Amino acid sequence: MAILSIVSIFAAEKSYSIPPASNKLLASPALNPLYDAKADAEINVWCDEFLKLQPGSEKSVFIRESRLGLLAAYAYPSISYEKIVPVAKFIAWLFLADDILDNPEISSSDMRNVATAYKMVFKGRFDEAALLVKNQELLRQVKMLSEVLKELSLHLVDKSGRFMNSMTKVLDMFEIESNWLHKQIVPNLDTYMWLREITSGVAPCFAMLDGLLQLGLEERGVLDHPLIRKVEEIGTHHIALHNDLISFRKEWAKGNYLNAVPILASIHKCGLNEAIAMLASMVEDLEKEFIGTKQEIISSGLARKQGVMDYVNGVEVWMAANAEWGWLSARYHGIGWIPPPEKSGTFQL
């Protein structure tokens, strides 16, 4: 089904409903108690500075109501205050950088240069990165990222380079995603998930679980175990697809069809609400699969290895945190968003 066909079918339905979850399978997310009003204000000020926003402006209010730092506070509920602030800045940067690299007002050459500069900064090569970026505003943002990474490196053990390498892949995939959008390529679901599981930015966030908690799983080869790989794959797909479910309306309004909803509609030649229901069902199936895999890890004896259950539970917390934050944040819903208590609702296209 071509994009124009999907557009006409979706337009005819005009609205869609996200159903409530039929079963509560994941652990309820708990907010890091150290992420207080002071930490939240620090993240908001950093975001304003990164985007050069006037406090109180519409964009600044939107960023505050998006509560980007809150995702870090839910996803890493047990880390110290010294860690949670740079982690929250990094996660906020992930969202802001995604917006910047999607900005049609930035020239393609500037876009390529800043993407390359970001990769170099993750490798600790800021001086070289600075030579690439001619746009002074983009250069200022690259420098701010470099400062966050220096702060983060004081707390994040990354001997294997897993965090750095996974972020390089994310930035590479952002460029591929941009190319697909420009050419209006409609991939099949497997190809889309190959892209989405990387552009979602989940891999570096899972790497931080190992590094921040200093579990040493990567160095001990534990992450190569098939059951751990399966847990990571399920968690990554769940986070990416739940995000697609929540962000669909915003992405569709921007003309971004690289979302699981239109991809499913294209594959199954179905309408909007049917595609939404399919996606919601896929998310729940992933939760069931995660719980089953977690039980396998326990019964196999793998859980007795030091740090394994800290990591597995950390992935589960990330899944639940992303789902919770998606309903709380105004990022996908707009200023003045009031989260529905049942985490379900009907939305107008």
Curated annotation (Swiss-Prot):
Binds 3 Mg(2+) ions per subunit. Pathway: Secondary metabolite biosynthesis; terpenoid biosynthesis. Mg(2+) 3 binds at residues 243, 247. A motif (DDXXD motif) lies at residues 98-102. Mg(2+) 2 binds at residues 98, 102. GO terms for molecular function: metal ion binding; terpene synthase activity. One of its GO terms (biological process) is terpenoid biosynthetic process. SUPFAM superfamilies: Terpenoid synthases (SSF48576). The keyword Magnesium applies. Its EC number is 4.2.3.-. InterPro entries: Isoprenoid_synthase_dom_sf, Terpene_cyclase-like_2. Its cofactor is Mg(2+). Keywords: Lyase, Magnesium, Metal-binding. It is an enzyme of class 4 (lyase). Induction: Up-regulated by alamethicin treatment. Mg(2+) 1 binds at residues 98, 102. Gene3D superfamilies: Farnesyl Diphosphate Synthase (1.10.600.10). PANTHER family: BETA-PINACENE SYNTHASE-RELATED, TERPENE SYNTHASE. The Asp-Asp-Xaa-Xaa-Asp/Glu (DDXXD/E) motif is important for the catalytic activity, presumably through binding to Mg(2+). Sesquiterpene synthase converting farnesyl diphosphate to six sesquiterpenes, with beta-elemene, delta-cadinene and an unidentified oxygenated sesquiterpene as the major products. Has no diterpene synthase activity. Belongs to the terpene synthase family. Selaginella moellendorffii contains two distinct types of functional terpene synthases (TPS) genes, the typical seed plants TPS genes (SmTPSs) and a microbial type TPS genes (SmMTPSLs). This is Microbial Terpene synthase-like protein 1.
